[in-house]
Swiss-Prot record:
This is DNA-directed RNA polymerase subunit beta'. Zn(2+) 1 binds at C60, C62, C75, C78. The keyword Transferase applies. HAMAP family: RNApol_bact_RpoC. The RNAP catalytic core consists of 2 alpha, 1 beta, 1 beta' and 1 omega subunit. When a sigma factor is associated with the core the holoenzyme is formed, which can initiate transcription. GO terms for biological process: DNA-templated transcription.
Length: 1201
């Protein structure tokens, strides 16, 4: 038996007529499908049972042989083989064409492959194939030339003149004859000769022809196979015909297209037998050609064939293309059994690793397991009765169900799955009702809320799948976000509010300055109303079970609040007692100033102290990160649950409400507005007198109103009571921000009009007072724009993620160390004077390339190939080192992936990355997922003649697609000193740069803003004006590494401006994929074709062989490809075809006879194999498990894994 999942590679090629006949099980001669009375397939028709196999299992057509025992018998009456009906999905038929027909893919694609092989223009080919002109196939000894086109009249004239002295023909037959006559060897050698002298257009054409010729030569395909003599007919189950109610039939469009081909073919055969006049035969041949074209690719040439209702029919090509095509609909995304979906509701009392599964749903999902267990326990005699029991919902099944789902994790997924945290595993618990219960802390990762979101459940079946779900995907394991290594499960909303309220301090609260002997006493006093949560009190420090206190501190009093005492009970004992929201307190110890001797006057001491800020959302996040660093997964997930419970409990007790009385308006608002109106009036006067331009007036007016709004906002914040519920909500980070409050109580400020331009009429009212009709109207613009932008952005961002995933899907950690001697020198990324990404953030979790020493003491901070931890990174920055050389994905030598050392730490686990980790896909998701948070619009930068700089999502697309940027900067091609900046004609400026050996001048347009002045020293490739550099121009004047660094910095700028943090390594992986190819300039003595795009590794290998054999190596220059182009240029044709331009990719691959080595993930998913990543990678698949010893029954909780 052939193991379908065990093969090395997949190859595609052209099929010869004999090959097509060998696939076939018989010829389809009639266009009939099924008999309308008996509903049985017609013999020799498109559904014929004799050709394709029986309709019913183990039963021939006439019913003579029934049952399995006749397996393999061919019925003597009807000729049908007795076998399974499933063969109707795999058996093919064929149609013997009465005249050869050209294959539209090879004739019509761009460039026309047929045209390149024959060296004819596509126009000429079309005339021949569709019977408009004759072509000379054999000139004989006449003055005609081979492949010369003749019109009908010319043909007749030459026939009379030369008689049988030459042969010419039309249609695909003539093409076939010419193709068959081509001598590939001779043509190839001629083209190689021509290349030596040819220039310009002729050279390009010669290279393209040579490429196709070499492809045919190397693949063993015969050019004449581009013309079909036999047409394969795909199996009937793949183009089914089904009966609808009311006796009508629905059928696949392919059947209609096949019927047209068969009808025309049969008519042509009859005409040829009758010896019909040539013109009629020619017309029929042309119609046959068009019918086959429509079958293969309808609509590629001329008007598409339409079905009822003027709808174009779906041809074979359309079955593969697009989102609904075979590749994306059925091969890359399949529907799976053992799954369900339902609405989600919050489950605040669940543990971190649990989810609530509705009983009915669980019963259906785990049905086979329950049935097996029922039979096993003797509650049912056989599977059938077990099934009946379940359908009747007998009471005894519930206990069995609980037993079955215990320790059997399920996967929960929420669409859209933007990153890997969109699918996580949970341990199910049964709940009443029909809604899935979700743990509140995982909502951030799923981006879920409970306003009607739905989620899907999947059951991992095999033991291996369950183990992977539990060990790798359990929600308690996914605490860190893969994009930046920060915790993704931070408390939100009510939980934040509760912990904020708990840790507030209040002056002169009830019982301030009371001294307690321990926590219990303090809590008792609080419950009886003697002290408040916010009262500052003293507690005997020795009673607090904290291992960080010194012996001296244990004998002192700790100044804290009741709330903070309660808050600290949720933290591990060896964690510092957190009394203030500072980094010092978090990472090192509780500051000494909070400890006082027992003799101190506590009340006076407290009265002299400032109030400490409560713990906001950010601090809670830092606490989680710190706990994770020190105690890892189990302890963190328990702590998170405690923090969640505490937050919910206290926010319930706090009873925060928002009433209209909480929104207090500002007394001085009227004065501020008056002042602003006066200033605007003055600006308008200056404009009327012609002192300033309209643009300047506009900018200044906007400035005035923004200043007014800011002033109101500032005074509002100062006038607010710290205990105002709205203020507490926004200050804690639970919900809303200060600008929401300003709009409620201050003024709404300026709005944007539909084009995104700011309207200079401000909205001076706030929501508390109410808006005037005009103000309301102005504000509708902005609201509408916000919503449309969001909708458009989501689609754009999703498509960006898809392209990123496609280009990086085969980047996997393949080995431990690639042994490279190159590295990337990094420093902090800056925009002007502002630091966008500091050096320590870029260093942490990377391997050093060289030994790093302290500049003064010369002591070693990190050795070569050491992992730089957070502590080492801080040391490096503190030592004043500004740039460090690290191992980077840019310089990694690993083929088809990167190595562990060049990648560094896995951000999602905080540990070293494992071999087999699919870092490409993680990188793509990390860049794509925050895409929805980026803005859409191009910002209008200040300044009168300011260019629009693209930012946000459009800028990210521009970078990754390597497009020419908007507002492009002019770069210098020489390094040296700027010697002069002069004003040329048309108010242009001319910059002259004196290099070491040459001098260049650049004309700068009048509107551009300069970045250099006379005397500036510039490097090659440096920008002379403000704006974005075109990376394709940069790669021409600088090396690859500078382009990579530039792209990395640009991507980071966009994301950091929007407050999104992404690890450098993700961008590095993507940029590495854009620069994988090299364009061959000079072929040397290798047999590479000039102008070919090839993988750098393949290129180096070809050159290595050339150098070793002592011949001249080829030279090439690196090429920067946009991600779409890079995806289509991948070595895997399956991956490229399933991405975009399916027909073009397949045409090309077929001619080249390409092999797909199945290295990426996508190709393997398409073929239904295990992906070569994670546990599916070769080195893990070969491991065999063995039992060392049986373990005792484990009763421990799942969290301890």
């Amino acid at each position: 038996m052939l193991d379908v999942n065990n093969f090395e590679y997949m190859k595609i090629g052209l099929a010869s007529p004999d090959k097509i006949r060998s696939w076939s099980h018989g010829e389809v001669k009639k266009p009939e499908t099924i008999n309308y009375r008996t509903l049985k397939p017609e013999r020799d028709g498109l559904f014929c049972e004799r050709i394709f196999g029986p309709m019913k299992d183990w039963e021939c057509s006439c019913g003579k042989y029934k049952r399995v025992r006749y397996k393999g018998v061919v019925c003597d009456r009807c000729g049908v083989e007795v076998t399974k009906s499933k063969v109707r999905r795999e058996r093919m038929g064929h149609i013997e064409l009465a005249a050869p027909v050209s294959h539209i893919w090879y004739f019509k694609g761009i460039p026309s492959r047929m045209g390149l092989v024959m060296d004819m223009s596509p126009r000429a080919l079309e005339e021949i194939i569709y019977f408009a002109s004759y072509v000379v196939t054999e000139p004989g000894d006449t003055p005609l030339e081979k492949k010369q086109l003749l019109s009908e009249r010319e043909y007749r004239v030459y026939r009379e003149k030369y008689g049988k002295g030459f042969s010419a023909g039309m249609g695909a037959e003539a093409i076939k004859k010419i193709l068959a006559d081509i001598d590939l060897e001779k043509e190839t050698n001629d083209l190689k000769e021509e290349l030596k002298s040819a220039q310009g257009q002729r050279r390009t054409r010669a290279i393209r022809r040579l490429e196709v010729m070499e492809a045919f030569r190397n693949s063993g395909n015969n050019p004449s196979w581009m013309v079909l003599d036999v047409l394969p007919v795909i199996p009937p189950e793949i183009r089914p015909m089904v009966q609808l109610e009311g006796g009508r039939f629905a059928t696949s469009d392919l059947n209609d297209l096949y019927r047209r081909v068969i009808n025309r073919n049969n008519r042509l055969k009859r005409l040829l037998d009758l010896g019909a006049p040539n013109i009629i035969v020619q017309n029929e041949k042309r119609m046959l050609q068009e019918a086959v074209d429509a079958l293969i690719d309808n609509g590629r040439r001329g008007r598409p064939v339409t079905g009822p209702g003027n709808r174009p029919l779906k041809s074979l090509s359309h079955m593969l293309k697009g989102k609904q095509g075979r590749f994306r609909q059925n091969l890359l995304g399949k529907r799976v059994d053992y799954s369900g979906r339902s609405v989600i509701v919050v489950g605040p009392n669940l543990k971190m690793y649990q989810c609530g599964l509705p009983k009915e749903m669980a019963l259906e999902l785990f049905k086979p397991f329950v049935m097996k267990e029922l039979v096993g326990r003797g509650l049912a005699h056989n599977i059938k009765s077990a099934k009946r029991k379940i359908e009747r919902m007998a009471p005894e099944i519930w206990d069995v169900l609980e037993e079955v789902i215990r320790e059997h994790p399920v996967l929960l997924n929420r669409a859209p799955t933007l990153h890997r945290l969109g699918i996580q595993a949970f341990e199910p618990t049964l709940v009443e009702g029909r809604a899935i219960r979700l743990h509140p802390l995982v909502c951030t990762a799923y981006n879920a809320d409970f306003d009607g979101d739905q989620m899907a459940v999947h059951v991992p079946l095999s033991a291996e799948a369950q183990a992977e779900a539990r060990i790798l995907m359990l929600a308690a394991q996914n605490i860190l976000n893969p994009k930046d290594g920060k915790p993704v499960v931070t408390p939100s909303q009510d939980m934040v509010l509760g912990n904020y309220y708990l840790t507030l301090e209040r002056e002169n609260a009830v019982g301030e300055g009371t001294i307690f002997k321990d926590i219990n006493e303090a809590q008792l006093a609080y419950q009886n109303g003697y002290v408040h949560l916010h009262s500052r009190i003293a507690v005997f420090a020795g009673s607090i079970p904290n291992e960080r206190f010194t012996d001296e501190q244990r004998n002192q009093l700790l100044i804290t609040t009741v709330g903070k005492l309660i808050f600290n009970t949720i933290l591990p004992k060896s964690f510092p007692y957190i009394n203030e929201p500072t980094k010092f307190n978090l990472e090192i110890e509780t500051p000494a100033k909070y400890f006082v001797d027992t003799t101190t006057d506590v009340r006076a001491h407290i009265a002299a102290q400032e109030l400490i800020d409560p713990f906001k959302k950010k601090i809670l996040g830092n606490i989680i990160a710190e706990v994770f660093k020190k105690f890892h997964i189990t302890e963190t997930s328990k702590m998170l649950d405690r923090m969640k419970d505490l937050g919910f409990k206290i926010s319930t007790k706090a009873g925060m409400t928002v009433g209209i009385a909480d929104i207090l308006t500002l007394e001085e608002k009227h004065e501020i507005l008056e002042k602003a109106h006066d200033t605007v009036e003055k600006i308008t006067k200056s404009f009327r007198r012609g002192l300033i331009t309209d643009d300047e007036r506009y900018e200044r007016v906007i400035g005035v109103w923004n200043a007014a709004k800011d002033e109101i906002q500032g005074k509002l914040i100062l006038s607010l009571d710290r205990l105002n519920p709205i203020f507490m909500m926004q200050d804690s980070g639970a919900r809303g921000n200060i600008s929401n409050f300003t709009q409620l109580a201050g003024m709404r400020g300026l709005m944007a009009d539909p084009s995104g331009r700011i309207v200079e009429l401000p909205i001076t009212s706030n929501f508390r007072e109410g808006l005037t009709v005009l103000e309301y109207f102005i504000s509708t613009h902005g609201a509408r724009k916000g919503l449309t932008d969001t909708a458009l952005k989501t689609a754009d961002s999703g498509y960006l993620t898809r392209r990123l995933v496609d280009v990086a899907q085969d980047v996997i950690i393949r080995e431990d160390d690639c042994g490279t001697d190159r590295g990337l020198t990094i420093k902090a990324i800056r925009e002007g004077t502002e630091i966008i990404e500091p050096l320590e953030e870029r260093l942490e979790g990377r391997y050093s390339r060289k030994t790093i020493r302290h500049p003064e003491t010369k002591e070693v901070i990190a050795r070569e190939n050491d992992l730089i931890t957070e502590a080492i990174a801080t040391q490096i920055v503190d030592a004043g080192i500004e740039e460090v050389t690290i191992r980077s994905a840019f310089t990694c030598n690993t083929k088809h992936g990167v190595c562990k050392k060049c990648y560094g730490k896995n951000l999602a686990t905080g540990t070293e990355v494992e071999v087999g980790e699919a870092v490409g896909i993680i990188a793509a998701q990390s860049i794509g997922e925050p895409g929805t948070q980026l803005t859409m619009r191009t910002f209008h930068t200040g300044g009168v003649a300011g260019d629009d700089i693209t930012q946000g999502l459009p800028r990210i697309q521009e970078i990754f697609e390597a497009r020419n940027p908007k507002g492009q900067a002019i770069i210098t091609e020489v390094g040296g000193e700027v010697v002069s900046i002069e004003e040329g004609r048309d108010r242009q400026q001319e910059i002259t740069i004196q290099g070491t050996d040459d001098r260049r001048s650049y004309n700068i347009p009048y509107t551009a803003r300069l970045r250099v002045e006379e005397g500036t020293i510039v490097e090659r490739g440096e920008a002379l004006t403000e704006g974005s550099v075109d990376p394709k121009a940069l790669i021409r004047v600088r090396d690859v590494l500078s382009v990579q660094e530039y792209l990395l910095a640009e991507v980071q700028k966009v994301y950091r401006m929007q407050g999104v943090e992404i690890g450098d390594k993700h961008v590095e992986v993507m940029v590495r994929q854009m620069l994988r190819k090299i364009r061959v300039m000079d072929t040397g003595d290798t047999n590479i074709l000039p102008g070919t795009l090839m993988d750098i590794h393949t290129f180096t290998e070809a050159n290595r062989d050339a150098i070793l054999s002592g011949s001249q190596p080829a030279t090439g220059r690196p090429v920067l490809l946009g991600i779409t182009k890079a995806s289509l240029e991948t070595d895997s044709f399956l991956s490229a075809a399933s991405f975009q331009e399916t027909t073009r990719v397949l045409t090309d691959a077929a001619i080249k006879g390409k092999r797909d080595e199945l290295l990426g993930l996508k190709e393997n998913v398409i073929l239904g194999k295990l992906v070569p990543a994670g546990t599916g990678i070769g080195r893990y698949r070969k491991l065999k498990s063995e039992v060392i010893k049986e373990t005792a029954e484990v009763t421990d909780e799942i969290t301890n894994i």
